[in-house]
Amino acid sequence: MTQNMFCFQCEQTAGGKGCTGCAGVCGKKADTAQLQDNLTGALITLASYALHQQKQNTVIDKLILDGLFTTLTNVNFHDETIQKLRQRVHAETLAIGGSIQDYDMQRIWNADEDIRSLKSLILFGIRGVAAYAYHAELLGYRSEKTAAFLYKALSALQEDWGLEQLLPIVMEVGEINLICMELLDQANTETFGTPAPTEVSLTVEKGPFIVITGHDLYDLKQLLEQTDGKGIHVYTHGEMLPAHAYPELNQYTHLKGNIGTAWQNQQKEFAQLPAPVVYTTNCLMPPAGSYQDRIFTTGVVSFPGVQHIASDDDTHQKDFSAVIAKALELGGYAEDQQFTGMNGGSKVTTGFAHQAVLSVADVVIDAVKAGAIRHFFLVAGCDGVNSKRSYYRDFVQATPADTVVLTLACGKYRFNDLDLGTIGNLPRLMDIGQCNDAYSAIKIAVALAEAFDCSVNELPLSMILSWYEQKAVSILLTLLHLGIKNIKLGPTLPAFVSANVLNLLVENYNIAPITTVEQDLKAILG
């Protein structure tokens, strides 16, 4: 059968094997998928030549971040912008004395399945790494070790290497991603303040408003500054929800609350919304015609026919005046609108980052020692359309009253409006933050392990993870790099992980797919 495209990087890939038709399940057309492969091949050629000729520079560093982030799922559907980025990669290749011979990605897709699996883990993992490094650099925080590794990892993709040479690089992706998440945590807290537990309303007040989605807190900061005093309210959506916990953002009284749920519901939630929506990162779904004129993209996000907010290359400043004008034109709702979470709740709470949790570490430790807390669950990761994802809500609802649930990333929308009660003064459900705040979860786990003089694997802690795109891959590799075992992963296992590579992960880390709530809870708690 003739393939129009090949892409299997996300959890929703067709048939659990790969998208090969005229378009991917994500909405990416075959031509766009090919252009993204061409861009990736150009990056591999540039990085390999620069590495071997020792001609790395900050211009190439930035191109690598932009190029890798552009090819992340649900980021860029715009052929023209992808082609322009590839042209910039070609220009830089020529500038350092290389030749334009893009690496043929079919050599990876058609390779031995175990080699393909390891190279896919490297490629998809560094796409996640690049996203986190991109956000940190916008705030002026840079890791030379990360920049150097991305050359090495891209170069490795064009080598005819075996398992023994590729597997260490797979694990190194996890190591570098930990550095990136730590750096981004530092960047966010030093720029926007230390997150604190914050209650967030799901009510949208009457009058003009703007919705901002994605992960870029700096974009939100600029939008809040430019809308201050204009009678326009701002609401977060999706992965922007944890922004409410940062003091430098929460101080703006017109940052009112959160609207909507996880990314996969946006086409329904935005269809009749009388307000513009700003996409700062993934996850963008192809917008319906009914609301496309109200959509704005920025950064590496792009979609044909949608207005794009450019930024100054040096200052990263953006002009949101077109968004503001659209908000005033649309006018918002005539009366307050009470929206709810997926379970009918009218409010959610976020901000339980490592600083907040560890500030009451003695209370947590005493509760464990006294038997008030029997177990911790990290139920975290991405959401999506797979019906099996209802498992995560059902799991959280079934956790006993003497257990604590930590969560992060957009998978939390399945259950973040539930009231699980408290253990003493501690809420049983704690939202740590965005997907990159997996670093906070790691910090909390390590601190608890030190307090109890044991390893993380010996803690009464279980990780029940959901994945969708490539940032989840990089986080999983970080957990494996740290030697964390007994992870349960769902809703399905990645199509790009071969049987042999999966067996390797099972043997070394006892990673396993989710089964049923009852079986998994019994296996964990007995």
PLM region descriptions:
Residues 40-191, 197:
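Electropositive, gly/pro-rich neighborhoods at or near active sites that engage anionic ligands
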Residues 2-37, 44-45, 171-526:
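Anaerobic metallocofactor- and corrinoid-dependent redox/one-carbon enzyme cores
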